[in-house]
């Protein structure tokens, strides 16, 4: 009887050790994968900011699905949308130049996670003499996987008369399986618009990939 009890005790001990080793290996694998993601996508640690708001909680795999979609489409050039509205000031029109990019987030195995979109809208005032004056820039996103925060845009004019704009914004994630840490990923936005032709192009690129 004692030998039977001893046998079962040994089995339980070996099972516990095996489970502990498996959990340890799994933790090390997750940590290693996350370190690789940091290097690949340019992930940075972030601090709580009232402007960022409540950041959705996602797994590292879900975050990677978003960032990989952006990385793979970094060279995609899209056409601007625009519309003329009532001007901010008397004797002029307001031109809204809108840039929208839609993506599908998928895991490494190809499983669909979510479709999401990024949108930048830049407002200009056009006076009666054709003068173009920058008003403001707004950033919006359609997703529950992250928060997107941008601050204005840098604008200049080329010799051909094109308005060129660029900015660096940030995607914020709270990663549930990495200690619920808060991280941010820089996204570069570049575009140009010709107000005479009413045409323009733009692109979104992970800043890490752009360097």
Feature-to-residue mapping (PLM):
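Positively charged n-region of N-terminal signal peptides that target proteins for export
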Residues: 1-6, 20-21
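C-terminal motif of bacterial Sec signal peptides marking the signal peptidase cleavage site
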Residues: 15-18
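N-terminal propeptides/leader regions of secreted preproproteins
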Residues: 20-110
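Mature secreted bioactive peptide module from preproproteins
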Residues: 85-211
